[in-house]
Amino acid sequence: MAQPPYGQQPGYPGQQPGQPAMPADLPQHARERLTQMRQHHFFTSDLSVSEFLLVKEVGFHPLGLVMGSSIYHIGYQPIRGVSEELTTLTQALYQAREHAMVRMEEEADALGADGIVAVRLTVAIHNWGTNVIEFVAIGTAVTHEKAPGTWRAPNGKPFTSDLTGQDFWTLLHAGYRPLGFVMGNCVYYVAPQAPPGHPGYVPQNGELVGPTQALYDSRELAMERMQAEAEALNAQGIVGVTVSETNHTWGAAILEFSAVGTAVVASREDHQIPQPSLILSVNG
């Protein structure tokens, strides 16, 4: 996975012995916020009350709300009139998302986190220029209270997960652990079907083979790339997968398919799923 060229500075004001150095490319106010949280043992979180308590119940303590962003200008790629992947657009959107994720991980790393839970990846289209898109990654950095430093991903970075606090609790109780938030995408141009009067036009009911194959291929490419990221983490599977379709600003014929989920691995051999409890409402 491509990494943006980020540097590390040897220290920052208020750094305590044994604490990791604050990444040099983080904004000044972000460094100040993270430093204050570490010094005062103060945390922020976007977890709900129930999620917060469930995360605590499985031995993790929130360290702080972490985020990363990337504003990207999407380059131009000519369209040849046939259904095909637009690789320039695919790579641009993937890199923008990756930059946002890496910066969020850097903030978590600066807090000494083991991982990030409840990750949300959003996209915003601004009016600053043509084809300008911002990706924002937000989550809650956590550390294991009894064994800090032992829950990181195989690549040495904090694990990332888009699971809710409830799903995170269930996953750990069932004998699995998250490794990383994985994603794949594909931007595809879907060539229009033959218009009425064209030799290829079929007036009766029938499958539109060209568009069907184009959409099928684009989804499969996104899924395949997501799976490749999970395999690179030595994961056994991916949970919570969602596949979305977006036009962004390119028109109806150009679609981006993105697949995201949380790569997981077994943490023990027995996988006992907690039995659900029956709750009766006293409300009428």
Which residues fall in each region the model found?
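Short, well-ordered alpha-helical segments
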Residues: 66, 71, 79-120, 182, ...
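Short, conserved loop-to-beta-strand elements that form functional interface hotspots
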Residues: 115-127, 237-250, 271-280
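Residue-level detector of functional hotspots within protein domains
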Residues: 38, 51-52, 102, 125-127, ...
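Hydrophobic, ordered structural segments
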Residues: 96-150
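Intrinsic disorder/low-complexity detector
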Residues: 2-89, 132-211, 262-284
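Short amphipathic alpha-helical surface micro-motifs
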Residues: 43-51, 99-100, 119-120, 160-166, ...
